Every structure is written in C-alpha cells, then in structure tokens.
Swiss-Prot record:
Record-stated family: Belongs to the transient receptor (TC 1.A.4) family.
Protein name: Transient receptor potential cation channel protein painless
Keywords: ANK repeat, Ion channel, Ion transport, Membrane, Repeat, Sensory transduction, Transmembrane, Transmembrane helix, Transport
Tissue: Present in multidendritic neurons, chordotonal neurons, a subset of cells in the central nervous system and a subset of sensory neurons in the antennal-maxillary complex. Not detected in gonads and dorsal vessels (at protein level). Expressed in peripheral neurons that extend multiple branched dendrites beneath the larval epidermis, similar to vertebrate pain receptors.
Molecular functions per Gene Ontology: calcium channel activity; calcium-activated cation channel activity; monoatomic ion channel activity; transmembrane transporter activity
Species in which this protein is naturally found: Drosophila melanogaster (Fruit fly)
Cytoplasmic side stretches: 1-490, 545-555, 608-628, 730-913
UniProt ANK repeat ranges: 154-189, 260-289, 368-397
UniProt gene name: pain
Length: 913
C-alpha cells in the first residue's frame, strides 16, 4: 500500500526532499512533524551534515539547530565535527549560522579533521574563485576565537598555506593582512621562521610583528622540524650545535641520545635527506639498535620500504652492520618493484643493491618459509625472477605448505635461465681444451651457517619438474640431464648393490621353492638355496627397517613398501617348515613368486637402459590405463553376467529330469557336471568369470543352450557391444599409450631415472625424521658421500665437459666465488701454477669400489653424447641470438645516422631558401 497517496508522508523523506528543493517551509514543517536532522542514512550521512556542507543553506542550518541539532555535532563514523562540514562549504552564511551567538553553546572552532583545523582547511583549499568567500569565513573564525598558530601534519600554519599559494593573486594581500592584524600571530616558531622569510620576499611593504626569540638551545623536536622542512644546510648547523651542547654532559647522557638519533635517522631515510643522514651516521651511533616498539622496522628495513637506495647503499657498506635472519629485505622490496621512482627513491635500485650484496642471503625465508623467488613469482615480475635466478636463487626451497617457488613460474623463464647456465671457457670450439661449463647454482642450495655434514634433498626441484606436465620437457635440458648423470653417478653404488643382492635373492627363493615342492633328492642343494633365501630375507628386513626408522610416517603411504612387507611375510612362510597343509603352502609359494617377480621387474625397469625402461614404462602405463577403463566399464560386465546367470543358469538336475537319455557312469558324470556348471552359468561367481573370458573372444557357444529368441538376442548384444566394441576400445587405448611413450622415450627415461633417484634420496634424508641413524656421524658421512653433490663434491657447484676429448667430465678443485676470505670480502684467487691441479676427472663415489656407471654406460668420467650434443646446440643458439642482437644494434645506429643526415639536409635546404 502506498501511504503517500493516502496522506501519510514520511517526515524524514519530506525533510530530505525539502533540502534538495531548497524549500525552507517544507523543511521546517518536516522538522515540526518529528523528522530528525541528525539521523544518519545507510551512508552514515545526516540531513544536518548535508545542510552544513551545501552552500546557501544558512536558514536550513538555523532551523536544524532550533530543532535540537548541536553546534558541536560529531559524525562518530568519520570523527568529523559540524564546524568542519561548514568550513567545507566555504560559505560565510553557513559558517555564520553555526557560529551565531547562543548562550551556553561554544563552538569548538579549532577541532581538527584529517589533521586540519577549519582555518587550515580553508587556507589549503584557497583559489582565485573562492578567495572572497574564504576571506569572510576566516574573518568569522578569527573573530570567534580561532587560533592562527595551529599547524597541520606538515607543520604549516594557515598563513603559511596562504603564502604558498603562488597562483592565487586576487585578495591574497587582504588575507595576509587579516592574519597580521591578529595580536597572537606567530611567524617565527614554526618551520624555522620560514613564514617571516616568505612575507619579506613576497610583501616587503607589509609591517611584520616583532621577531620572537626562542633561545639558543636546540632540541630533538627542532631537528625533526628542520628535517621535515627539507633545509639540510640548516639541519647541519643545528645538529652541530646540538652535538656541541651534548659534549658537556655525562657519558650516560650521551648514550641516552642514541635512541633520539635513531628517530632522526629514520626520518631522514623516509624523507630522502641524504646529507642529514650522513651527518647523523658520522656520530658513530649503533646502527644495529632496535627501536622501542618491537614491530617497528630497523634502519635497513626502513630504507628498503621507502625505496631510499642511497641510504641502503651507505648502510650496507657499514662494517658493523648486522642483519638478522628475520629481516626479509628482499621479500619486502619485491612487492614494491612496480612502484615508479619518485623524488630520488627507487625500489628497483634497492633490489639490485640487495641481490648484489654479500650480506644478504638470496634464499632468506620468512615465517612461512617463503623465499624471495616465491614473491617474484607471486607478483608475476619476470625481471625479478631472472635476476634472482642469475644470482643463484635456489629453486628447491619448500614453503610451510610444501610448495616450491617454481610451481607457478612460466616454463619459458626457467628454460631461458637454464640456457644461460651453459657457457664455455672462451676457447675455440675445435680446440682440444675447449670446455662446456655447466653451472648448478640454482639446483644446489648454498647454506651459509649449516654444518658440513648436513644432508640436503637435492632432487626436490627436479622431482617437481618431472611431475609437472608444463615443465617436464626441461628434464631433457643439458643442465638437468647432466645433473641427473652426476646424481646417478653418486647413488648408482646403492642401486646396483641392491639390484645385485635382490637378483640373487630372486634366483635363490624361486629355485628353493621348485626344489622344495618337487621333493628333490638334492638335499644339499635345497639347503644351500634355502640358506641364500634366508640371507635375502634378512637383507630385505634390514632394508625396510632402515626405511621405516628414517621415515615412519610416510613409509606406509607407498604401495611399493606395502608390497615389500607382504613379500617378506610370504617369503618367511614359504621358507620355514610350517604346519600348513600342502595346498596352503603351494598357494603361499605362488603368491611369493608373483611378488618376487613384480619387485624384480620394477628394479629392472629402473636400469639406466633406455629400451628396458621404455618397455617397463609401457607395461605400467598400459596396466594403469586398462584398470581405470575397465573399472568404469565393469558395470556392463556385471550386467551381462547377471543376464546370462538368469537365462542360462538352470541346474543340471533340472536338465537331466527333462532329458530321456540314460545317465553316464559316476566318474564321467561328475566331470561333465563340473564342465557344464562353468559353461552353463549355474553360479553367480562362475558366471562373472565366464563372462570375462567371453570378453576376450573365447565364447564356446556350442555349450550354451539357447532356449528362446531372447537368449539369442542377449548373446548377440554381448558379442557386438562387449567383444567387438569394448574390447577393441581397450586395445586402442593401449596402442595409443604405447605410441605416446615411444614418441617420448628419452623423456620418459629421464622421468623414470628422476623417480628412482628421488626415492633413494628421500630414503637417505628421511625427511628430517631419521632419528638416531642420521645422528650418527659415521652413518651421516656415508649417506652424504653417496648422496649429496654439494658442497663435499662440487665446491664450485659447476662442472666442465671436454667435448673434443671423449666428453670427459672435470670437477673444479677451487672456489673463486663462494670460498671468500673474511677480510674485506675479497676473492680467493685460483692458483695459476701449472703444477697445482685446478680440476680433476670425475671419480667413483667410493674409492674402494669401481664406478658402477661403467657397467652400462662406458667409462666413469664421460658424459653422455646426447647431453653434450644438446649443450652445444644451446651454445650455438645463444651465439646466434647474440649475433642477431648486435646486428639489430648496428641497424638501429645506421637508421639514426640516416635520420640525422636527413635532418641536416632539410635544415640546409631551408636555410638556402
């Protein structure tokens, strides 16, 4: 129902409408009807506020006050008073209505909103157009008692704001005279007397008040104000005077001023006062002191946040600077790299200073274990990613949630950086000493304060690349391929030793099982293979116990580990003299042989032979694809099984009762009944098995008794839909999978090797839960020797390959970049004498054992020919790109020269005319 049409008008709506129409009579009538001018709407705005801030509403303001609105009304949401709303209107009438004398009501004319008093607000918004109205408003406020000396957040008084309005010409002198006529005006105490200097410069004819002398003593507040004013010359003078006054004090008083210096330093950094910063820093104050508030940034963090690269550069050169691990300087600056440089500040320059500084850890992590590379990827800053990677950012740092920084990184950025890690020694490609240098600085974390025996999971980033469909092609990059070669070179001892022992165990337990169940007369041979089987079982138990101790939580999450536990259990039952009957023992032996063979196939598939790993991968992928597809289509198998059971599952006795033929002999009858029971679907389980057999095309249709047209129809549907369509579909999926695997055989081989190495490394590291095993120095040293490449094997985190000398791999023996002396952070130079070897050939992981790589891949110290060929291709591509870039630069310079000559020619023609 519309109450407005019935004469019931909402007083509040009438009040708003009257103000919009500037109808004072309806406005007063609405107030008389009970409307509230102070009532706020959904936007937290009242009619009273609108009247105060709208020019020409003097009568409306008086009406509101007469009906109960307060002259000191405050909007609680905005903390804004009525006087500030009236000043925003810049209407003298509105302001006069509010300041009208009312007994008992004193307006607070100096109340601030947004750090501005009404006088400051009027002066700050002064223009040529509103100068007369602003003059009248200021006169009203000053006559009412407003102070002309209250400053805003920049320590500007109202008169100072007026003097700074250089574009305002009309009425400016009258406004200044209005302030000068005020008896309490102070033009000397704020901003070091800048108001007096401006008055003398702009209006020298005006008579100024006498200069106020505040005394010779200068305090911290004075220095703070001078810093904010930007007069660094004056600050240097005042600070020198301030220090002179402090020299007469006690030592404890001098120490007490260190915190005050810290505040001055922070202020100089925030405002970019470099001269003041150097002056304060020259006092020798402790730059590592923390402020009083715990969450407040220190000096270096302040310089990074405000982009003051000059102060940051000065602080990083301080020998006494100590950076705490929780500084997170790079993380703080990366989020601000998109901000444009302003007034000398540049977050980009700060970022470059930090990544090039020896004092800043490029892999520093915050509380969530997020490293700077995480933030560069998060903010999609490609330039920051490239610079971090170039300076050795580790790509395998895991966050608190187990994610890696390269998770959302564009693959092309990572590939481009990997290309830059493949360089040469500068010799000609045909020379004998031509070297391909491969740098692994992003694959091996450089720990500053970690112990030498700390184990690292170096396979984590490569395992992630292998799992990512967008990045797994990078496994064929020479950087990753060569790294996998080195890791396999270290871990191959464990793999081949495990493979050898398990092969002996497989042969022993299968031979022992055959001899045992065939009751061979070779008792000694049976006992010998039984002993070998027990030794193999003992080895498996020891191996699985070590894995469980190292990683008890994750152990049972692996299907392979569960299968190995089942294998150990069944092997024990097979080898021991149990009280089981013969049939149970045979079943246990059968399952034991199956599990032993499956485990052996998995080990064979992990061999570094491309043909073997490809075929094992095809077997695994086709099996997984078949299981997934058949699980979905199994509903049709069950459906047809039930149909056949219902149609053909008549009992043999029922068929015989209907048959007039005599019964066969008893033995033949039982065999025939069993055969007919399977072929005639007499039991549900047998019906399911028979249906699965028929799915392969083995129908045995002659033994099926078709009794009606419907039985023929159901059987025909099964043949068409299941045998022809579904079975060929499954075959097609298998063929498709094998074709894909063959097309990516080399990539799949790299994935298999990555998975094997990652699994072995995870077992050895134990994910940090290895307990007393890794606490043992000897065990930890052995694991580190077999597993970790850096720092005990590659101190320089790079290798050299000789493509013209049999692809030999050389290991640098010295570190010119990372092994620095403590004095002046200088470099430790490589020895130049030819008698001192700088590099060595790749050697076996354990000197007592031969290199296991040579069993299948040739000599130990030789890199794969495919890897070397790809590395040379990368170098050729980089050289070609560099040549194209240089040619483009030459073309650009030629075009600029042509343009310059044409401009000269045109100018010459114009001059002749």
């Amino acid at each position: 129902m519309d109450f407005n049409n019935c004469g019931f008008i909402d007083p509040q709506a009438q009040l708003a409408g009257a103000l919009a129409k500037q109808d004072i009579r309806q406005f007063v009538a609405a107030l008389d009807s009970g409307a509230l001018a102070d009532l706020q709407d959904d936007r937290h705005t009242s009619i009273y506020e609108k009247a105060l801030s709208t020019p020409g509403c003097r009568d409306f303001i008086e009406a509101c006050i007469d009906h109960g609105s307060q002259v000191n009304y405050i909007n609680k949401k905005l903390d804004k008073a009525a006087i500030s709303y009236a000043a925003d209107s810049r209407d003298p009438g509105n302001l006069a209505a509010l300041l009208k004398y009312r007994p008992g009501n004193k307006v607070q004319v100096d109340r601030k909103y947004g750090q501005l008093t009404p006088l400051n607000s009027l002066a700050k918004n002064l223009t040529d157009e509103n100068a007369p109205d602003v003059y009248s408003c200021m006169q009203l406020l000053l006559d009412y008692g407003a102070s002309p000396n209250i400053v805003d957040q920049g320590e500007f008084t109202p008169l100072h704001h007026v003097l700074r309005k250089s574009k305002v010409k009309a009425g400016k002198k009258e406004l200044i005279q209005l302030f000068l006529d005020h008896p309490e005006l102070d033009i000397d105490s704020y901003r070091n007397g800048e108001v007096r200097r401006l008055l003398q410069a702009q209006f020298p004819e005006l008579k100024l008040p006498e200069e106020r002398h505040t005394g010779p003593e200068i305090d911290i507040q004075t220095l703070q104000r001078t810093l904010r004013d930007g007069d660094e010359t004056l600050f240097e003078q005042q600070f020198a005077e301030y220090l002179q006054n402090l020299k007469g004090g006690a030592d404890n008083q001098l120490n007490a001023h260190q915190e005050e210096y810290f505040g001055l330093l922070q202020e100089s950094i925030k405002r970019g006062r470099q001269r003041a910063f150097d002056v304060i820093l020259s006092t020798g104050m402790d730059i590592n002191s923390r402020p009083g508030r715990a969450n407040e940034a220190n000096l270096v963090e302040t310089a990074v946040i405000y982009g003051n690269w000059q102060a940051l550069e000065r602080l990083l050169k301080e020998p006494n600077l100590r950076l705490t691990p929780d500084s997170k300087l790079l993380n703080a600056v990366i989020g601000r790299l998109d901000e444009p440089p302003y007034d000398g500040s540049s977050h980009q320059r700060c970022f470059e200073l930090l990544i090039n500084s020896d004092r800043v850890d490029i892999n520093e992590a915050d509380s969530g274990r997020l490293v700077p590379l995480f933030f560069a990827v998060k903010y999609r800053n490609t330039s920051a990613m490239q610079k971090l990677l170039k300076n050795g950012a580790y790509i395998g740092s895991k966050s608190a949630f187990g994610t890696l920084p390269i998770k959302d990184m564009p693959p092309e950025v990572l590939e481009e950086h990997f290309d830059s890690c493949i360089t040469t020694n500068g010799e000609r490609p045909g020379d004998q000493n031509f070297e391909i240098i491969i740098d692994y600085k992003n694959l091996m974390r450089q720990e500053r304060d970690s112990g030498l025996n700390q184990l690292q999971d170096e396979m984590a980033p490569i395992a992630f690349i292998a799992e990512s469909k967008e990045m797994r092609h990078l496994l064929q990059h020479p950087l990753i391929s060569s790294f996998l070669f080195l890791k396999w070179h270290r871990l191959s001892v464990i793999f081949y030793l495990n493979f050898l022992i398990y092969s002996l165990f497989t042969a022993s337990i299968i031979t022992y099982t055959l001899l045992k169940f065939h009751e061979s007369d070779q008792r000694a041979l049976t006992a010998f293979f039984g002993l070998l089987s027990w030794l193999g079982i003992s080895y498996l138990i020891l191996r699985e116990c070590i894995q469980w101790i190292m990683s008890p939580v994750r152990y049972f999450w692996s299907i392979t580990n569960i299968m190995e536990v089942a294998l150990i259990t069944l092997s024990i039952f097979t080898c021991m003299e149990s009280s089981f009957d013969k049939e149970t023992q045979r079943v246990l032996a059968v399952f034991t042989i199956l599990l032993v063979s499956m485990e052996f196939c998995l080990l064979v598939g992990s061999l570094p032979v491309l043909s073997i790993s490809t075929h094992m991968l095809m077997l695994r992928e086709v099996s997984n694809s078949f299981l997934k597809s058949f699980t979905l289509y199994s509903i049709f198998v069950l459906t047809f099984s039930l149909c056949f059971y219902i149609l053909f599952g008549k009992s043999v006795e029922e068929d015989q009762s209907k048959s007039a033929t005599p019964c066969p002999p008893l033995g033949k009858k039982e065999g025939k009944d069993e055969e007919q029971g399977f072929n005639t679907f007499t039991k549900p389980i047998e019906a399911v098995i028979k249906t699965i057999v028929m799915l392969t095309g083995e129908f045995d249709a002659g033994s099926i008794q078709f009794t009606s047209i419907y039985t023929y129809l159901i059987f025909l549907l099964f043949v068409i839909f299941m045998t022809i369509v579904l079975f060929n579909l499954l075959n097609g999926l298998a063929v498709s999978d094998t074709q894909v695997i063959k097309a990516q055989a080399e990539l799949n081989g790299a994935i298999c090797r990555t998975n094997v190495l990652s699994r072995y490394e995870q077992v050895l590291t134990g994910h940090g839960r290895a307990g007393f095993l890794l606490g043992n120095h000897l065990f930890r040293s052995i694991c580190q020797r077999l597993m970790n490449i850096y720092p005990n094997y590659l101190s320089l985190r790079q290798i050299s390959v000789l493509p013209n000398d049999g692809n030999k791999v050389l290991i640098p023996m010295s570190d010119p970049f990372e092994m620095r002396t403590l004095k002046k952070a200088s470099f430790q130079q490589l020895p130049l004498s030819a008698a001192v070897p700088q590099k060595k050939l790749l050697d076996p992981p354990l000197r007592l054992l031969p290199c296991c790589c040579s069993l299948l891949t040739g000599k130990c110290s030789q890199m794969s020919g495919r890897v070397v060929k790809r590395a040379l291709e990368v170098i050729d591509q980089k050289n070609a790109a560099e040549q194209r870039r240089k040619q483009e630069q030459i073309n650009d310079s030629r075009l600029k020269l042509i343009e310059y000559k044409l401009e000269q020619l045109i100018q010459l023609v114009q001059d002749r005319k």
